Amino acid sequence: MINIHATKKLYAKLPAPISAPQSETTPLTPTLSLGEREQNPLSGWNANLLILQRRNCVLLVHDATRFPLFVKGLLKADFANFNHLFADALMNTLLKLGASQSQLDTAAALLAPCRFDTACDRSVQGTMNQMAGDLEHRLWFDNARLDDLSSYATGAWLSDRPCTVKGQKDCIWPNSAMLALLSRAGNSAPAKRNVIQLADYLSSRNG
């Protein structure tokens, strides 16, 4: 599972089957044991609903690395398809960062259904609020239209900053931290993997 801690504002937008714990697999779910899924290093995100230029957007921040994902222009039906939205945002943002083939393969193999709750972390939310503020300022300062903004490039841009993490002395850079996490996970993973076609994650959106 990919555990996502949603704000109440976002949680209220999710259909009941999505906001409830999910156990079913999807075509994106790798062949992992239950124990491996519970220890999934990609799991653990905080997420919030942003209203930008009257459009529903979601900003997610990975708890351990502070790596952000940005999803823009969601319609009501899109919230019921969050597994695909998450996978699409993750893979394409990693591509924008210049992730290696090995790192992309590891990320694809770790994808699993999203499970939502409202147990948000204040420290992660602090980072998320800073990123949201910077994004809003960028739209205002550049007089930019949300529709002209690449979700994936925006996520990569937001990740290129030092962030503080509670309990850690040194700052971390989310982009480097996420790539390092994927490298470690790939090195420790079993040799047998599903064959992943990265083209499945390439969106028709501007990115």
Q: Which residues are covered by each model-predicted region?
A:
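Short, basic/aromatic recognition patches
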Residues: 18-25, 40-50
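Cysteine/selenocysteine-centered motifs that mediate thiol-based redox chemistry or coordinate metal-sulfur cofactors
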Residues: 94-133
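Low-complexity, highly charged intrinsically disordered N-terminal segments
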Residues: 1-8
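A short, polar/charged loop-to-alpha-helix boundary motif
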Residues: 76-93
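Intrinsic disorder/low-complexity segments
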Residues: 26-39
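A short, conserved beta-strand element enriched in hydrophobic/aromatic residues
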Residues: 44-81
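Long, charge-rich alpha-helical interaction segments
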Residues: 145-159, 171
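Short hydrophobic short-linear motifs embedded
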Residues: 168, 172-205
